[in-house]
Amino acid sequence: MAFKRINKELTDLGRDPPSSCSAGPVGEDLFHWQATIMGPGDSPYSGGVFFLAIHFPTDYPFKPPKVNFTTRIYHPNINSNGSICLDILRDQWSPALTISKVLLSICSMLTDPNPDEPLVPEIAHVYKTDRARYEATAREWTRKYAI
């Protein structure tokens, strides 16, 4: 089941790729993908290229994939290990979701962080209290790690 579904998503991604994102298998392993997200133009991540690792469980799509940033990023919902705090990757996962939809959700999270459910409370605090400093630091990290 998982193999067939992952193959279908790969085909669909090739046919109709989401804007500013791409993803595909690492080598021959269909259960391990690498994804690329271009930093949204209307965010402090603009101009950056961010890489993510995607690991599909054997019972996909009934369990969510594990998705991690491998590029460092300054964001309240993404920690230094690249873990992402996103409800659809946890309790709000549904088998109707696809990697394409997950990547688009991550893109929109880059534009609109959720400081009320932070993975990094310090960054969320800066986001809420000093937006200019948050954006300057996010731009600096983007230049340093993603360009």
UniProtKB/Swiss-Prot annotation:
Enzyme class: transferase
Pathway membership: Protein modification; protein ubiquitination
Name of encoding gene: UBC1
GO molecular function, one term: ubiquitin conjugating enzyme activity
Catalytic activity: S-ubiquitinyl-[E1 ubiquitin-activating enzyme]-L-cysteine + [E2 ubiquitin-conjugating enzyme]-L-cysteine = [E1 ubiquitin-activating enzyme]-L-cysteine + S-ubiquitinyl-[E2 ubiquitin-conjugating enzyme]-L-cysteine
GO biological process: protein ubiquitination
Active-site residues annotated for this sequence: C107 (glycyl thioester intermediate)
Species, as recorded: Colletotrichum gloeosporioides (Anthracnose fungus)
InterPro entries, per database record: UBQ-conjugat_E2_core, UBQ-conjugating_AS, UBQ-conjugating_enzyme/RWD
Entry EC number(s): 2.3.2.23
Function text: Catalyzes the covalent attachment of ubiquitin to other proteins. May also mediate selective proteolysis pathways.
UniProt induction comment: By hard-surface contact. Ethylene and the host surface wax enhance this induction which is essential for appressorium formation.
Keywords assigned: ATP-binding, Nucleotide-binding, Transferase, Ubl conjugation pathway
Residue span, UBC core domain: 1-147
Name by which UniProt lists this protein: Ubiquitin-conjugating enzyme E2-16 kDa
Family label: Belongs to the ubiquitin-conjugating enzyme family.
PANTHER family the record matches: UBIQUITIN-CONJUGATING ENZYME E2 (PTHR24068)
